[in-house]
Design a protein with these regions (language model features):
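A conserved helix-loop-strand patch within extracytoplasmic ligand-binding domains
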Residues: 109-159
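Short, well-ordered beta-strand elements
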Residues: 32-44, 62-68, 135-136
Length: 164
């Protein structure tokens, strides 16, 4: 966990330096002269990770202000509107697809961990108990929807056509 936090701090610090070098007029200085970095994140686990990174960045003179979001659209829109300096919640394919669809100029300042995808049910405890014709919800965005379809295929629940 300590290695992960150190890596997260490095990525965020790198992003902060990248943002600082971009001449963003939205940057603020804290009352004590520290640089303020406003990052948007989804609550779990991203904002939790940022809370752990906050004291590490403070040692480097960066005050981290975290804005929590409850969906995956608003952080990118807030970034596009310069309400925040960066966000921390998504993988690059999702960011690129979102930026293209919403005509935003978003770039990755560093990698993030990729959340595992799983099958969840309150009623069904084993896939062999899944009734034929059962409905399964998947994410509504192309990148994560594609990941979900591949997971369903790997579990033998669907067959996808060959992409060639």
């Amino acid at each position: 966990m300590r290695k992960f936090l150190a890596l997260a701090a490095t990525v965020i610090l790198g992003g902060a330096l990248l943002i600082a070098g971009c001449g963003n007029d939205n940057k603020q200085a804290a009352s004590d002269g520290k640089q303020v970095l406003k990052i948007g994140a989804t609550a779990v686990p991203h904002a939790e990770i940022l809370e752990q990174v906050k004291p590490i960045l403070a040692k480097d003179g960066i005050e981290l202000k975290i804005t929590e979001f409850t969906d995956y659209n608003t952080p990118n829109l807030a970034l596009g509107d310069k309400e925040i300096d960066a966000n921390f919640f998504q993988h690059v394919p999702y960011m690129e697809e979102f930026a293209k669809a919403h005509k935003l100029d978003l770039v990755s300042a560093g990698g993030v961990h990729l959340e595992p995808m799983g099958l969840y049910s309150r009623k069904i405890k084993d896939l062999k108990d899944l009734p034929k014709g059962a409905k399964i919800a998947i994410p509504n965005d192309p990148t994560n929807g594609g990941r979900a379809l591949l997971l369903l295929q790997k579990q033998g629940l669907i067959t996808l056509k060959d992409s060639t």
